[in-house]
Amino acid sequence: MSAPRVSFVSLGCPKALVDSERIITSLRSEGYEISRKHDGADLVIVNTCGFLDSARDESLDAIGLALNENGKVIVTGCLGAEPDVIRERHPNVLAITGPQAYESVMSAVHEAVPPAHDPFVDLVPPQGVKLTPRHYAYLKISEGCSNRCSFCIIPALRGDLVSRPIDSVLREAEKLVNAGVKEILVISQDTSAYGLDIKYQEAMWQDRTVRTKFLDLSRELGDMGVWVRMHYVYPYPHVDEVIPLMAEGKILPYLDIPFQHASPAVLKNMRRPAHQEKTSRRIQAWRETCPDLAVRSTFIVGYPGETEEDFEILLDWLDEAKIERAGCFKYEPVKGAKANDLGLEQVPEEIKEARWHRFMAKQQQISTNLLKKKVGKRLPVIIDEANGTIGKGRTRYDAPEIDGSVHIQSRRPLRVGDIVTVKIEASDAYDLHGIAV
């Protein structure tokens, strides 16, 4: 009897990708095969995103495609928290579960397509099945979020903060390193709040006591001999404690902090505690400790109540802070978000669009000027793509998929996952160009 085959669709953020990896690891450990195509598979699982209307539409379309091409579909993920929405559009799905419901997903799979007898558990690698390239992996340290930003429905979808004990996280990281992973990307909904919900619970790791805390996690990961990159860091004061580890080279000099805006009025409406003057001073202090630091952030323009003055404050903040990487989103109303009940004036779509373009032009100018300063330097670069002596990689200041790249020429063949020294010869708005030395 051949093993049952399951096709898998993973939508949304890196946190959802980790959920998908866990489900696929469970499937493989029970003898299921993973199919790249819906047609011919015994079942399709769709891990959905439900944060923005555009993401909900994409998820519903993916479910429809799976039903058309296969017919047997199990839905999980954030949109699964709203089963009525899914059933209204697609009444024939086999089962619907919410996010992080790994056991419920597996139960639904067992009911629809029972596993083959005597699965070969040893076919599953110790680090589990990963959907990223072999040389980097996402490490999820917690679920949920206890903040109540008015534009966000993550707490409603994924619940309040639930931190993984630090020994569990470090064991997973160790398995990843032993499997050859060269870069670990730490993710959660609120990385710097790690351990707060369990009162920074202590655990034993390598014969010493460590706390379930952002600082301890950073220090221990920094001793594993790989690149460690911190994502989704909320700007709490204790983030300052981690900057010296970056200056020492323990973890990458990179902070992904979603500031969202700079206007005090908009931040208040967003229920975000940060203030533009304080964040500017914080960034300046971080750079004094670690001059090599790169800051990435995301911002929302066109938030309800945002005035031209508010937007100008944001542009001025960009000029002052000069962060290395910035993404920008036009505000979309999210069903269930508190922002819908604030009674604020909506920003017209054409103004949102114009502000988005102005923001991107401003940040492009800043990025271009900062990257010019890299020309002539020799930088370590991790190779993401290689074709003989031509390749593409990333510096310590760039995360995969969301940041810039280094386009490389080399005398010797390049290999994906290698970290090579590159002399930077040129730059443009977002990328660098250089020669491996």
Curated annotation (Swiss-Prot):
Classification via InterPro entries: Elp3/MiaA/NifB-like_rSAM, Methylthiotransferase, Methylthiotransferase_CS, Methylthiotransferase_N, Methylthiotransferase_N_sf, NA-bd_OB-fold, Ribosomal_uS12_MeSTrfase_RimO, rSAM
Pfam families named in the record: Radical_SAM, TRAM_2, UPF0004
Keyword field: 4Fe-4S, Cytoplasm, Iron, Iron-sulfur, Metal-binding, S-adenosyl-L-methionine, Transferase
Recorded catalytic activity of this chain's protein: L-aspartate(89)-[ribosomal protein uS12]-hydrogen + (sulfur carrier)-SH + AH2 + 2 S-adenosyl-L-methionine = 3-methylsulfanyl-L-aspartate(89)-[ribosomal protein uS12]-hydrogen + (sulfur carrier)-H + 5'-deoxyadenosine + L-methionine + A + S-adenosyl-L-homocysteine + 2 H(+)
Binding residues annotated for [4Fe-4S] cluster 2, in chain numbering: 145, 149, 152
Subcellular location field: Cytoplasm
GO cellular component, one term: cytosol
Cofactor stoichiometry and binding remark: Binds 2 [4Fe-4S] clusters. One cluster is coordinated with 3 cysteines and an exchangeable S-adenosyl-L-methionine.
Function according to Swiss-Prot or TrEMBL: Catalyzes the methylthiolation of an aspartic acid residue of ribosomal protein uS12.
Recorded superkingdom: Bacteria
One GO biological process term: tRNA modification
Protein residues bound to [4Fe-4S] cluster 1: 13, 49, 78
HAMAP family, sorted: MTTase_RimO
Primary location: cytoplasm
Protein name: Ribosomal protein uS12 methylthiotransferase RimO
SUPFAM superfamilies cross-referenced by the UniProt entry: Radical SAM enzymes (SSF102114)
